[in-house]
Structure formats: structure tokens, C-alpha cells
Amino acid sequence: MRVAVLGNSGSGKSTLAGWIAGYTCAPLLDLDTVVWEPGKIAVARSPEAARSDLHAFCSAKKHWVVEGCYASLIDTALEYSPVLIFLNPGEGQCISNCRARPWEAHKYASRAEQDQQLALLLSWVSEYYTRDGDMSLTGHQACFNAYTGRKVEVTVRPQLDPPSAEVLAWLN
């Protein structure tokens, strides 16, 4: 089982990908960990380095889950024919999820540091619907529409505990 999860910040990517990885015992790659310099906030690595790390992860494992908001990197993962899950729950749900987000220790040294970035994050989430590019609704829709493999667009929060029949069908 290979799964790629794509969506806006706050769409539920990390929650769903983490659940799938746990349920299937598959390794999980959060694309933020290959895009950004370790231990540095908003210091990007080269796109080539990120793609190289993603290829290394995908080619080394039979089963995996990757998640992120980077359409170009998801496109790279799609070369390995995963199920593509595009989370598109709408701006209100993404904002609500961001406000309720637990501390992301892999991104921030403290909860306080993360909270200092919340206003910027909420603005980023809202701009998703009007900007263009790799991390926009337009970019995500283009990635989703171009993929000819198994895929699903999810517009409501999936039921994970216990998993709904719909969620289990994505994994079969």
C-alpha cells in the first residue's frame, strides 16, 4: 500500500497520513521534513535535494505514506503509483483545524514559538484559495486531475476511529 496525501495547511493531512501509517504499519514521510532545513524555520532546501530525498524514501520501501502541501513533490511520489488522497474540506475547516493544532515539535522549539506563527499560518491558509502555484488550490486540483491512478477527493473530515467503510476502501 502506497498513499500520497495532498491538501491545504489545516486540511487534516498529518492526521490522516499518521492514522493510515499506523493502521497499515507503513513508514510515513512528512514532506516538510525534506523541504525545510532541519532546525530552521522557513529556510528551504533546494528542490533537487527535496526530490532526491523523496525518491530515496519511495524507492526504498514497498509500502509508505507521504503527506504535504507541495504539489510538485506529490507529483514525484505519484511516479510510484500510490493512492492519491486530496483533502479539500474548505477554508473554514482548515482554519478551525489550525487553531486546534497540537504542538508540532518537529517544526518548532516550543508551543509558544508555534503560536507566534499562528496569524501568519491562518493568512496562508486563506490565501490558498486565491493564489497560484505549487501550494494553491489551483495547483492541487491540477495535480489531482492529471493523475490517472487511484485517487479520491475528500471534502469532509474522514471518520478514523473507528474507520468508516469509505476510509477502509481507500486502503484496499
Language-model-detected regions and their locations in the chain:
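Walker A (P-loop) ATP-phosphate-binding motif of ABC ATPase nucleotide-binding domains
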Residues: 2
